[in-house]
A protein has these predicted regions:
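C-terminal catalytic lobe of FAD-dependent flavoproteins
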Residues: 102-109, 114-221
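A hydrophobic C-terminal alpha-helical subdomain
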Residues: 225-227
Length: 227
């Protein structure tokens, strides 16, 4: 992989300057998702990167994991501040995911580890005597209208904004991107015809993400208590 430094359209081609040299191409596919910044153009105002993390427990053993998750399925809740978890493929650990919006670039911090430890204890109170061996994270691309962006403009093809469903969506959206190149036409998907919402206060929103996260947790705690 190499880092994109800049790109510009010259006649019928795009010239890309990267950390490894220059590239000249007729079509430019932008699939930056949660890592969309100013260098992709004004479209970066359509999307924001939200931190997403996964933690892996120590080896608990198949018997204990089976007791904690009897059907060995993937579980997810329906809250705004949601969690999801599942057994590892060998059924010896538990993998636990969350969106701690305050935790930009803090995979190895004690705060993130403590956060996961507390949440796993709350959701799986019978787990007892466990530790967290690994934590990794990145950014989920969330659009302001919560729909993926799939469009072609001046031979620049945008495929981004999966809102946390990238594993399921991106193979198909990648097919759509390739199809736009081979047919030299825009996608016929309904979402490609919907106007994407821009938010020019994006950078202020990023600063206030921790506050928004706290608001949703507070709101859901009240709902759980009184509804």
């Amino acid at each position: 992989p190499c880092k994109l430094l800049s790109h510009q359209k010259i006649d019928e081609f795009y010239e890309l300057k990267t950390s490894e040299g220059k590239i000249k191409t007729q079509y430019l596919i932008i699939a930056t998702n949660g890592y969309s910044e100013k260098d992709i153009g004004n479209e970066h105002y359509n999307i924001i990167g939200v931190p997403s993390y996964i933690a892996a427990t120590n080896i608990l053993g198949q018997e204990k994991v089976q007791k904690l998750l009897p059907k060995l399925r993937m579980y997810s809740d329906s809250k705004n501040d949601l969690y999801y978890f599942r057994p590892s493929p060998d059924h010896k650990r538990i993998l636990f995911g969350a969106f701690p919006v305050w935790a930009y670039g803090m995979e190895n911090s004690k705060m993130v580890k403590s956060f996961f430890y507390k949440k796993i204890n709350i959701i799986l109170p019978k787990i007892e005597n466990f530790s967290i061996d690994y934590i990794w994270g990145g950014k989920v691309g969330v659009t302001f209208n919560t729909l993926p962006m799939v469009k072609k403009t001046n031979n620049k093809i945008f495929v981004l904004g999966c809102n946390g469903s990238g594993v399921a969506l991106m193979p198909y959206l990648g097919y759509q991107a390739a199809n736009m190149i081979t047919t030299n036409q825009n996608s016929n998907l309904v979402i490609s015809k919907i106007k994407n919402e821009k938010n020019y206060f994006k950078f202020f929103i990023i600063k206030f993400l921790p506050l928004l996260g706290w608001y949703y947790r507070f709101k859901e705690n009240l709902e759980n208590k009184f509804l």
